């Protein structure tokens, strides 16, 4: 799921993704936006 959070690295996405999807959520930075996924 792409969320509306700007990023330059996946680390910036980890907290917002975990806040939204819980502690097991993963995060990537794609095209300057965060992408969250559940494992």
From Swiss-Prot:
Protein purpose: Blocks Kv1.3/KCNA3 voltage-gated potassium channels of human T-lymphocytes (Kd=0.25 nM).
Keyword Transcription regulation: no
Record's protein name: Potassium channel toxin alpha-KTx 2.9
Domain comment in the entry: Has the structural arrangement of an alpha-helix connected to a beta-sheet by disulfide bonds (CSalpha/beta).
Disulfide bond residue pairs: 7-29, 13-34, 17-36
SUPFAM superfamilies given in the database record: Scorpion toxin-like (SSF57095)
Organism: Centruroides elegans
Gene3D superfamilies from the UniProt entry: Knottin, scorpion toxin-like (3.30.30.10)
Main location: secreted
């Amino acid at each position: 799921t792409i969320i509306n959070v700007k990023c330059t690295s996946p680390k910036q996405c980890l907290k917002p993704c975990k806040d939204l999807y819980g502690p097991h959520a993963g995060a990537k930075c794609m095209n300057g936006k965060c992408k969250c996924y559940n494992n």
